[in-house]
Amino acid sequence: MKRMLTFLLLVATAAPALAHPHVFVEMMTEVVFAADGKLRGIRHHWKFDDMYSAFVTANLAQDGKDPSPEQMLPIARTNVESLKEFDFFTAAKVNGAVVKFDEPTDYSMSYDGKDQTVTLHFVLPIEATAKPAKTFVFQIFDPSYFVAFAFQRTGPATLEKAPAGCSLSVSKPGSLSAADQKKLADSAGTMNSPGEDIGMKLADSVITACP
C-alpha cells in the first residue's frame, strides 16, 4: 500500500499478509442538522474488526478491566487526525456539488467487552454552503479497498434534528464488472490493491432529501 493511515500501518505490521481487504469496519451514521434546520454534517460510528481492536487495546486493559474511553481518547485523536489526509474516507455532495469537511469534532472511542471490539465515534462537519441542502449524498469507502466499510444491517443511517419532510435512504451499488471481479480475485493473498476505485464501486450511497 502506498497510502496507509497510522492505525492501519500498525495493523499491517502486526498481522500477516491477507487478501484485500485487510481491515473490516461496520458502520452506522447519523446525518445531523442544526437547530436552525441547516445541514451540520455526519456523525460516524465505525466498529473495527476484532484483530484491529485487540491490537490497539493490548496494553490498555488493567486488572482484567475493559479499556476506558479516557484510555482510548489518544487513539481516537490519532485516528481522526490521520483520516484528514484521506478526506475521512467520505465523499459527499450537497445539491449535486462536491463539498469538503471541516475538522472533526466530538471524537471518542468505546470498547464493547462482549465482542471485544472498539468503535470510533466522531462528527464530520460539512463546510458552510450558501444554499439550503435540498439533497445530500455521501459514500464511505477506501478507494483501494485496504479497508472494507459496510453498514450495519439494522438502522444503518438515521436523521438527527432534520426539518419536517426530510427523508433518508441507502442505495446499494451495482454489481462489479467481470474485469473488476478478476482484479479483486487476483489481489487475494497479496498486498496489492485490486484498483484505486474498487472501494467506491462497492460503496453504498446514503441519500438525504429535504423539501
Question: Can you annotate each of these PLM segments?
Answer:
Residues 9-10, 82-83, 197-199:
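A general structural signal for short secondary-structure junctions and capping/turn motifs
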Residues 18-25:
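Cleaved targeting-peptide boundary
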Residues 51-130:
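Structured domain cores in non-transmembrane regions
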Residues 2-10:
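Sec-dependent signal peptide recognition
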Residues 95-211:
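Mature, soluble, non-transmembrane domains
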Residues 28-55:
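N-terminal targeting signals for Sec/Tat export/insertion, comprising classic cleavable signal peptides
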Residues 14-16:
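N-terminal signal peptide c-region/cleavage motif recognized by signal peptidases
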